[in-house]
Amino acid sequence: MENLSERFNALQEQLMNIYEAAEQTLKAQILHWQTLRKEAVTLYFARQKGINRLGYQPVPALAISEARAKEAIYMVLQLESLQKSAFALEPWTLVDTSTETFKSAPENHFKKGPVPVEVIYDKDEANANLYTMWTFVYYMDSDDVWHKTTSGVNQTGIYYLYGTFKHYYVLFADDAKRYSATGEWEVKVNKETVFTPVTSSTPPGSPGGQTDPDTSSKTPTTTTAATDTSPRRQSINKQSQQTETKRRGYGRRPSSRTRRPQTHQRRSRSRSRSRSSSQTHSSTTTTTTTYRSRSTSLNKTRARSRSRSTSRSTSTTSRRGGRGSSTRQRSRSPSTYTSKRSREGNTRGRGRGRQGRAGSSGGREQRRRRRSFSTSPDSSKRVRRESPKYRGVSPSEVGKQLRSVGAKHSGRLGRLLEEARDPPVILVRGDANTLKCFRNRARNKYRGLFRSFSTTFSWVAGDSIERLGRSRMLISFSCLTQRRDFDDAVKYPKGVEWSYGSLDSL
């Protein structure tokens, strides 16, 4: 207990000496953060031992001491990296290397020379907001090389130059949505107006009014596809319409008016032909009538009900008169009979029991014929040939599926073809240094759970060379299962955002 208090007092004394000396060197700033790290470790150890006070200093919770120690370690690493650059001999104060300055916008950058920027909304002096523009900004590129750049302000926002690009870290249009009623603001630097009131309707090329790049790129493509009248395009559209019609399942089919004259012609033939030929035409007519529209089916249903009532009376006559009555039935007017009645007339003289069974099984026989027609070998082969499951995946379909592959595919080939439509990736957004550190850790810690990492990159405005938003990085995977395993195991750094996506090729 006493030794721990003595060590803590020694660290406090060393910190006081650093504050009194106020040296403006990187070496002094590194020593300052190393001392803060030792202090946090001492307080953490004291809390573990159940000590609540070290002298007059209360011991904080373990989580607080741990966070302070990690923060000090991170700042030491950044300052040691800056010490190896060409800016090590510049003057660096405690304010320049503090966490408050380092984490202010633009985040995770060393900055010097704050300049106040006042933005007045709706021409109201009381409705104003203050921002900080930094004269110099120090950033590290993708090759871990430090650069020094200047910062500026315009009607869009406050930015710093990343090479030749303008990287905005403050956008006035974002705050205008909250503070402004008319969407107008005025920019003042050091109490001097540098930009007169402007509206929030900025041009599409600027970051404040940037439109969705996918919308501008997809619109002409859709128009071209719609106006293309080449024979190849027409044949493809016709095939797609046929495939779409077959996938409707049991939906309503369009009524085919061209089949009615053909059906009428077949009926007229069945009236004039013999008893055997009428049976053949009656089955064809029944099959054709089954696939008519709903209105035609209603009319035929009524006709069937009338034919059944007529057939019952006729069957009674056949039972009374024997075989001679069936001969009289064939000599009657053809307009009273359909092809279905001619088929029923063959069984009227065979006895009462068989006649009853034939009448009751008429509906089931019709359903069996309908089922056999829909599941015929030709139709099943035709659907199987046109099904994309057995045709493979065309280049235009790769990456277009939005849902993950389910368990409906029993074969391995079908699952591989479905997964080929959606090569999975993860888009990570954050600070460039944070993303690079995360990439280096993930390569060793999560080996085998990913395919590859990309370098950091940024989006550029449509009509300019200004960088938009934070840095990006892509993580590719071999399949959706690998991406899910990676997402379950990985722990992203603080402030890093991610989203799912897919690409046509990697």
Swiss-Prot record:
Phylogenetic placement of the source organism: Viruses, Monodnaviria, Shotokuvirae, Cossaviricota, Papovaviricetes
The record's account of how the chain is modified after translation: Phosphorylated.
Gene Ontology cellular component annotations, sorted alphabetically: host cell nucleus
Localisation: Host nucleus
GO MF annotation terms: DNA binding; DNA-binding transcription factor activity; nucleotide binding
Pfam families hit by this protein: PPV_E2_C, PPV_E2_N
Biased composition (Basic residues): 248-274
Stated family: Belongs to the papillomaviridae E2 protein family.
Region (DNA-binding domain): 422-506
Gene3D superfamilies: 3.30.70.330, E2 (early) protein, N terminal domain, subdomain 1, Papillomavirus E2 early protein domain
Keywords annotated in UniProt: Activator, DNA replication, DNA-binding, Early protein, Host nucleus, Phosphoprotein, Repressor, Transcription, Transcription regulation
Biased composition (Low complexity): 196-229, 275-297, 310-339
Subunit structure and binding partners: Binds DNA as homodimer. Interacts with protein E1; this interaction greatly increases E1 DNA-binding activity. Interacts with protein L1; this interaction enhances E2-dependent replication and transcription activation. Interacts with protein L2; this interaction inhibits E2 transcriptional activity but not DNA replication function E2. Interacts with protein E7; this interaction inhibits E7 oncogenic activity. Interacts with host TAF1; this interaction modulates E2-dependent transcriptional regulation. Interacts with host BRD4; this interaction mediates E2 transcriptional activation function.
Disordered: annotated span: 196-406
Biased composition range(s): Polar residues: 232-243
The UniProt record lists the keyword Kinase: no
InterPro entries with a match to the protein in the record: E2/EBNA1_C_sf, Nucleotide-bd_a/b_plait_sf, Papillomavirus_E2_C, PPV_E2_N, Reg_prot_E2, Regulatory_protein_E2_N, Regulatory_protein_E2_N_1, Regulatory_protein_E2_N_2
Domain of life: Viruses
Name under which the protein is recorded: Regulatory protein E2
GO BP term, example: DNA-templated transcription
Function: Plays a role in the initiation of viral DNA replication. A dimer of E2 interacts with a dimer of E1 in order to improve specificity of E1 DNA binding activity. Once the complex recognizes and binds DNA at specific sites, the E2 dimer is removed from DNA. E2 also regulates viral transcription through binding to the E2RE response element (5'-ACCNNNNNNGGT-3') present in multiple copies in the regulatory regions of the viral genome. Activates or represses transcription depending on E2RE's position with regards to proximal promoter elements including the TATA-box.
Region (Transactivation domain): 1-201
SUPFAM superfamilies on file: E2 regulatory, transactivation domain (SSF51332), Viral DNA-binding domain (SSF54957)
